[in-house]
């Protein structure tokens, strides 16, 4: 089928590239000329495991192209996916400016049978509003909702082997087109529902996962006070099939481009409908406070005095497997430390350049290796769960630090191994 993606950000790129790999004829449109030029040279603007391989295959098979020109080629599209950003504004309300900008640019070029698919995360009711908007301008297109559930760091696998595909439609024709598009993914479960429910599923899913993270983080705080083991607790709870083990790793809080934004948007939605959803408010508050709580733990290990201390931060992305630093707890921790006159030496294996764009400070030094970041520091903070941190020569690092203290906010190192080397080692959920 002929498919066009409007917006070549994270979702549009991954979806478009894999759709091309699966055999569809795909055009990815974006206003950023520099990005488009690089993509046509097989240079990705994001880090995502294996995506470069699929990009190469799709381009070489001539089933994928990138452009910034909205032209009559759109007339051949069977479906147009809107995959632009929907950032938060004000008190968490989703800003749909880019969605409507995309609609405005394409509706005069596409044929009457083309299906407009909203893959961007939008509040319930948005698709119906878009249909009304198009009708007010004399156009009558089918509009469907098809939210994405891609996890950064494993997005390729998530697209090829999804748990489910959610489709929100108001007629059988739209459903048939989407089923045909996803036909190469055999054995996939489809959830076919109305437009509003489809839109709400995305918000509810992300908010529920965020709730699991906030809950296990608070259980880690309890373990710290009473001497429990948070890893064993997470395992014991997660092996219950009703709960599941995913998103039960205690840490410095959730971040990224989805969870913080989506739970705020859902909270905004329920408040607009005069529903007092206390769970959402509690999760938002808990996660907002989490980086400050982590800094308090660092201060405790340094006898309450942070001013002038040298601290190594290992990991800057909001999680491993991505270069994304948006709403990263690690970045939030660094900012708090800098405000307390701390000298920070930071390293991340993938996200260093994005971190530099996000945060600069006279007391912040970005290093090209974890070992260099740890030289002569008062404490080492592991803020992101990169596997390479487990493989470091910690004996070498022990000989380089000023004070052999590690606080592991991701619980990735082995307590006994670190202590045998000579480190004072603390993990999330352990007594300080």
Curated annotation (Swiss-Prot):
Catalytic activity line of the entry: UDP-alpha-D-glucose + 2 NAD(+) + H2O = UDP-alpha-D-glucuronate + 2 NADH + 3 H(+)
Tagged with keyword Oxidoreductase: yes
MF (Gene Ontology): NAD binding; UDP-glucose 6-dehydrogenase activity
Keywords: NAD, Oxidoreductase
InterPro entries hit by this protein: 6-PGluconate_DH-like_C_sf, NAD(P)-bd_dom_sf, UDP-Glc/GDP-Man, UDP-Glc/GDP-Man_DH_C, UDP-Glc/GDP-Man_DH_C_sf, UDP-Glc/GDP-Man_DH_dimer, UDP-Glc/GDP-Man_DH_N, UDPglc_DH_bac
Residue numbers binding NAD(+): 2-19, 30, 35, 121, 152, 261, 326
Active site residues per record: 258 (nucleophile)
Residue numbers binding substrate: 148-152, 202, 206, 247-251, 255, 319
First-tier enzyme category under EC: oxidoreductase
Coiled coil: none
Pfam families: UDPG_MGDP_dh, UDPG_MGDP_dh_C, UDPG_MGDP_dh_N
SMART domains named in the record: UDPG_MGDP_dh_C
GO biological process, one term: polysaccharide biosynthetic process
Record pathway: Nucleotide-sugar biosynthesis; UDP-alpha-D-glucuronate biosynthesis; UDP-alpha-D-glucuronate from UDP-alpha-D-glucose: step 1/1
The EC number(s) this enzyme carries: 1.1.1.22
Annotated family: Belongs to the UDP-glucose/GDP-mannose dehydrogenase family.
Listed name of the protein: UDP-glucose 6-dehydrogenase
The organism of origin for this protein: Rickettsia conorii (strain ATCC VR-613 / Malish 7)
Gene designation per UniProt: udg
């Amino acid at each position: 089928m002929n498919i066009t993606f409007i917006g070549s950000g994270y979702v549009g790129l991954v979806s478009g590239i894999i759709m091309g790999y699966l055999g569809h004829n795909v055009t990815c449109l974006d206003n950023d000329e520099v990005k488009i030029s690089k993509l046509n040279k097989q240079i990705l603007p994001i880090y995502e495991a294996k995506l470069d391989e699929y990009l190469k295959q799709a381009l070489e098979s001539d089933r994928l192209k990138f452009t910034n020109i909205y032209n009559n080629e759109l007339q051949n599209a069977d479906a147009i996916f809107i995959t632009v950003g929907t950032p938060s504004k004000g008190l968490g309300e989703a800003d749909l400016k880019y969605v409507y900008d995309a609609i405005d640019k394409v509706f005069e070029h596409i044929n009457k049978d083309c299906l407009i698919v909203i893959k961007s995360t939008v509040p319930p009711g948005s698709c119906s509003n878009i249909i009304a908007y198009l009708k007010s301008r004399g156009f009558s297109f089918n509009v469907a909702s098809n939210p994405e559930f891609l996890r950064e760091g494993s997005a390729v696998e998530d697209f090829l082997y999804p748990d489910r595909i959610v489709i929100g439609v108001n007629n059988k024709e739209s459903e048939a087109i989407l089923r045909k598009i996803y036909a190469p993914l055999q054995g996939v479960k489809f959830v076919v529902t109305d437009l509003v429910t489809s839109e709400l599923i995305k918000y509810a899913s992300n908010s529920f996962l965020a709730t699991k993270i906030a809950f296990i983080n608070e259980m880690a705080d309890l373990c710290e006070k009473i001497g429990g083991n948070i890893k064993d607790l997470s395992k014991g709870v997660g092996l219950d099939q009703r709960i599941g083990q995913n998103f039960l790793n205690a840490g410095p809080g959730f971040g990224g481009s989805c969870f913080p934004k989506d739970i705020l948007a859902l909270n905004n939605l329920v408040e607009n409908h005069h529903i007092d959803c206390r769970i959402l408010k509690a999760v938002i508050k808990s996660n907002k406070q989490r980086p400050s709580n982590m800094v308090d733990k660092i201060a405790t290990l340094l006898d309450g005095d942070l001013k002038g201390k040298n601290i190594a931060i290992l990991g800057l992305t909001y999680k491993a497997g991505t270069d994304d630093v948006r709403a990263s707890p690690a970045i939030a921790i660094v900012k708090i430390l800098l405000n307390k006159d701390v000298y920070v030496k930071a390293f991340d294996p993938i996200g260093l350049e994005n971190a530099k764009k996000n945060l600069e400070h006279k007391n912040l030094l970005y290093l090209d290796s974890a070992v260099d970041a740890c030289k002569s520091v008062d404490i080492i903070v592991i803020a992101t769960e990169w596997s390479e941190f487990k493989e470091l020569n910690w004996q070498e690092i022990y000989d380089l630090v000023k004070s052999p203290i590690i606080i592991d906010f991701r619980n990735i190192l082995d307590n006994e191994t670190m202590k045998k080397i000579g480190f004072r080692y603390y993990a999330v959920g352990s007594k300080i």
